[in-house]
């Protein structure tokens, strides 16, 4: 199954996608701002033959849902109106930290390049966690 992961944010929304065998999660793109965000994601999902969506859910360290989690659920409701495919949620705690660790690699030396890719890499981290959980024995 082909999944599209979303690291939702007010200013930047990162997207990642997996291969049909569900073995590799790859950063796809970062969408800037909110203008036409839902339409852009719906178009990407259709063009990439996505069968389900995974949205990062920002939980607090005590597992409670804060204000940002409510915004993610509202975003998911808007997305459901445009896509007739399942939407899953995945705990995204520490996904940005893991993405920042990956960006410390030498190939990401320019600060602007790092910032541009961070949200897409965080989305890939979210998708990797989802796939590991889903495919665990």
Identify the residue ranges that each predicted region occupies.
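Phosphate- and other anionic-substrate recognition elements at nucleic-acid/protein interfaces
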Residues: 2-3, 10-11, 16-137
